[in-house]
Amino acid sequence: MQCDFVDRILNEYDLLNAIVYRSKFTHEVKVGDVIIGGNNPIVVQSMALGGSGDVYQDAREVLELAQAGSELVRIAINSDKAIKSVPYIRDVLINHGFNSKMIIGCGQYEIARLVKQYPECALALGKIRINPGNIGFGDKRDKNFEDIIEFAIKNDIPIRIGVNWGSLDKYLAAKLMHDNSLRGTPDPDYVVLRKALVISAITSAKHAEKVGLPANKIVISCKVSKVRDLISVYTMLSKICDYPLHLGLTEAGSGVKGIVGSSAGISYLLLHGIGNTIRVSLTQQPGESRTNEVKLCQEILQSIGLRNFSVQVTSCPGCNRTNPKYFHQLVSDVNKYVADRMSVWKSANPGVENMTIAVMGCVVNGPGESKHANLGISMPGYGERSVAAVYQNGEKLCTLEGNNIFEQFVSIIENYVSIYYH
């Protein structure tokens, strides 16, 4: 009887997992070689800091983001010089083997003028992002919006309609706040603002369709700076539209705060089948590269099992059973070795990004965790025999000892990669 009960619970759990991990249907939007939406992999995006005034430096930054793994890179189109630099940046990317349409132009009220004034430069963009909250003001707002949409229609360029919590259409927000105040039991302000974001995005997308832009040329986003608001807004969006959704926590902050907030919000939504492309927006430390944002996007997707980008190294934190001097050094060395070798492996050994390696500190969980990985090594803890057991595909392969355990293990890793990924 107890066994039947457990089986029933497990069956219900499996069904729940199947529901949670099933992506919601959306249109497919093609941006050059990249497809956003449908059943396609979640797309990693980033944004160049730019603003150097040096087109060569700006191109190097975009190239660096692409080489780090960003599949689409957004740049600010806020001046004549900025839009005139796009063809050069595109050519740099093409010369390095990247998608010719991976640049996204992001502009505010000035972008309508720039696109009209420099159409040949704008044609080098793969996608254009516009913000309904500041595309224009007063009687210029709709005209600017429609000018961009008509340019996109004429030149087969997709559009992201990106609403931002910090630049929400003030007229829409004021109207909804006023209407809410007349209710018998008004909603809290944050609820009204969430609804305003969704309404702004959807009405703008429908207006773009009315002008003539096909639904499969539209991506939408509603950026907020708090995790609960992000989840609420995108859950609403997912229920009422079939446009692909661009996820991200705007103004996430820096350091651990930004990493945790972005990871929590994006992961929750993706695990509920919501979202088709992601960007992590972190405030960088002085001199820090924005490639960290790309790596974080990749780590989010890999940690929740949606995409693999690199060999996964699993390791325990260590405790008073482990020898920190040797164990922590081995973990560091293996991680560095894998990072250094990934570009070579990925070009010569297809599928290697799906490989897992376990580096464990003692006999308590070491052998078990190592057996779950493709390759694993269990170091001796205090009081254990001074040998390291190595496991391959769930079976014990050998034991290593001496002062060059790292070098011996690396040789085993290289041999495994050459045999199983070719």
Swiss-Prot record:
Ranges in coiled-coil conformation: none
EC number: 1.17.7.3
Pathway assignment: Isoprenoid biosynthesis; isopentenyl diphosphate biosynthesis via DXP pathway; isopentenyl diphosphate from 1-deoxy-D-xylulose 5-phosphate: step 5/6
Cofactor annotation comment: Binds 1 [4Fe-4S] cluster.
Swiss-Prot/TrEMBL catalytic activity: (2E)-4-hydroxy-3-methylbut-2-enyl diphosphate + oxidized [flavodoxin] + H2O + 2 H(+) = 2-C-methyl-D-erythritol 2,4-cyclic diphosphate + reduced [flavodoxin]
GO terms of biological process kind: isopentenyl diphosphate biosynthetic process, methylerythritol 4-phosphate pathway; terpenoid biosynthetic process
Cofactor(s) listed: [4Fe-4S] cluster
Positions with a binding annotation for [4Fe-4S] cluster: 316, 319, 362, 369
Broad EC category: oxidoreductase
Sorted UniProt keywords: 4Fe-4S, Iron, Iron-sulfur, Isoprene biosynthesis, Metal-binding, Oxidoreductase
Main function: Converts 2C-methyl-D-erythritol 2,4-cyclodiphosphate (ME-2,4cPP) into 1-hydroxy-2-methyl-2-(E)-butenyl 4-diphosphate.
Entry's family note: Belongs to the IspG family.
NCBIfam families registered for this protein in UniProt: ispG_gcpE (TIGR00612), PRK00366.1 (NF001540)
Identification of the protein by name: 4-hydroxy-3-methylbut-2-en-1-yl diphosphate synthase (flavodoxin)
Organism: Ehrlichia ruminantium (strain Gardel)
